Amino acid sequence: MKLKSLLSVFTISIVALTSACSTKNAGPSADPDKLIVALIPDENAATVIQDNQGLKDYLTEAFDKEIELVVTTDYSSMIEAARNDRLDLAYFGPLSYVLAKAVSDIEPFAARIKGGTKTYNSCIIGNTKKGVTSFDDIKGTTFALGDPASTSSRLFPELTLAENGLTKGKDFQGVFLGSHDAVALAVQNGNAQAGGMACPILKSLKKKGVIDPSKVTTIAQSSPIPQYPWTMRSTLSPELKEKIRFTFLDLDSDKVLKPFNADGFASITDSDYDGIRKAGKLLGLDLSKFVK
């Protein structure tokens, strides 16, 4: 599918989703004919939609239902859609999941497995030309962050910096750019001297040739973070929820898994994300303020 067509599909999806969120009705069906599947907007939306056509085809066949993939404009919009019961399935980041769970009737059921683990890391990166290769070099710089509700492009970068004696607004100026790829490009281009983003996305961007390893260096990695969870609307029928669980946990298609940089998906529960809640408290963040 051409990029122009994909952008049209993306725009239509967002308009439809926004319209639906503003329409009052008796409530969503427990076994809808069409499943709305939201993917986290951590990279360019058109790219996310394009890369996940394999997922759409897989779910269409597995459930014998129409599948609509949507990518909201930002994390807050995705949380708001979940709060209004407009998402049947949603792939959240760890922090955005915690925020959504606080205001929505959703439940996590699967998380990405890579290299035998259900965790990943956030990377602190620096512009080598600007000489930003250590924590000391970050002082006085502009530090690029992703979305305010991002785990690995906001929460854990700030936590890692704080653990190394650096505070946003005091030791460096933080700027939110919305997505991980925007952070990487800003650091590479020198618009920001350092930044924080998911290590797997950085690795992918280097592999694609988008980021030049000679221009962007990894200063540090965070402590392990629980992987992005797949969630489902709790008001779906028990039969459909069980089928959804099985469909994802049994998934072994390279075509579907490749965009997630995953070997598969494994069961996960809400308690796996208590560490995210604790990280927010350590930084003194009022997580309720992240939700509109």
From Swiss-Prot:
What is any Pfam family matched here?
Answer: Phosphonate-bd
Question: Subunit composition?
Answer: The complex may be composed of two ATP-binding proteins (PhnC2), two transmembrane proteins (PhnE2) and a solute-binding protein (PhnD2).
Q: Which SUPFAM superfamilies does UniProt cross-reference here?
A: Periplasmic binding protein-like II
Question: Which residues are in coiled coils?
Answer: none
The role this protein plays is:
Probably part of the ABC transporter complex PhnC2D2E2. Binds strongly to methylphosphonate (MPn), ethylphosphonate (EPn) and inorganic phosphite.
Question: Which residues belong to the signal peptide in this entry?
Answer: 1-20
Membrane protein topology class: Lipid-anchor
Q: Which family does it belong to?
A: Belongs to the phosphate/phosphite/phosphonate binding protein family.
- Lipidated positions per record (S-diacylglycerol cysteine): C21
Q: Which compartments does it reside in? A: Cell membrane
What biological processes does GO assign it?
A: transmembrane transport
Lipid attachment of type N-palmitoyl cysteine occurs at which residues?
C21
Task: Give the record's keywords alphabetically.
Answer: Cell membrane, Lipoprotein, Membrane, Palmitate, Signal
- Superkingdom of this entry's organism? Bacteria
Gene Ontology cellular component? ATP-binding cassette (ABC) transporter complex
| Protein name according to UniProt | Probable ABC transporter phosphonate/phosphite binding protein PhnD2
